[in-house]
Regions:
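Extracellular/luminal low-complexity Ser/Thr/Pro-rich, glycosylation-prone repeat/linker regions
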Residues: 25-34, 59, 87-88, 134-154
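Short beta-strand elements of extracellular/lumenal beta-sandwich folds
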Residues: 44-64
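Solvent-exposed, conformationally flexible loop/turn segments
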Residues: 40-48, 110-113
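Bacterial N-terminal signal peptides that target proteins for export
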Residues: 1-9
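Low-complexity, intrinsically disordered segments enriched in Ser/Thr together with acidic residues
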Residues: 105-127
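Short solvent-exposed strand-capping/beta-turn motif centered on an Asx-Ser/Thr pair
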Residues: 56-62, 73-75, 123-125
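A surface/secretory-pathway sequence property marking extracellular, secreted
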Residues: 65-101, 106-107
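Bacterial N-terminal signal peptides
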Residues: 9-17
Length: 154
């Protein structure tokens, strides 16, 4: 026959065990979105270069307030920008030259993507034709190593 104190101890033990499992379950559910550069393609025509960037996200949650920074080749101006993107200011002596483009991508759902296409003028002949892109969001990223890419064309 169980005494009242034994029943109380068993009830307390069961309550503690179920609470501990619930806490462990909450710890394994982490808010995260692996935002990444999926594609960076750069093409060249006679007078322009075009960079096509695809930003993708996965790992359960949406990437909130996603942003993309495009580092432009030296000595280029902007030919075409998509909505939501703005070029950094150029130097006072040659205001047409730009260093970077910043894009607000909004929220990207899990397994969703955003595509951005930017066209620039060609840099002077001896300058490298290299684009660098970096993406990030307000959601914690479990794998930040895939947030950057760069391409150089001839």
């Amino acid at each position: 026959m169980k005494t009242a104190s034994t029943r109380f101890a068993l009830s307390a033990l069961l309550l503690f065990a179920s609470t501990d499992v619930a806490v462990a379950d909450r710890r394994t559910q982490v808010w995260q979105a692996d935002i990444q550069i999926r594609t960076l393609e750069v093409t060249r025509s006679k007078s322009t270069m075009t960079a096509r960037i695809v930003v993708f996200t996965e790992k359960d949650d949406e990437a909130r307030e996603a942003r993309l920074v495009i580092l432009l080749p030296l000595g280029v101006g902007i030919d075409r920008l998509p909505p939501g993107c703005a070029a950094t200011a150029g130097p006072s002596m040659v205001p047409a030259l730009r260093a970077a483009v910043e894009c607000d991508l909004g929220s990207i759902p899990d397994r969703g993507f955003r595509e951005v296409v930017v066209s620039t003028t060609l840099p002077p002949d001896l300058m490298p034709k290299r684009f660098g892109v970096f993406t990030y969001s307000a959601t914690p990223d479990p794998a930040p190593g895939n947030n950057y890419a760069e391409r150089t064309i001839q």
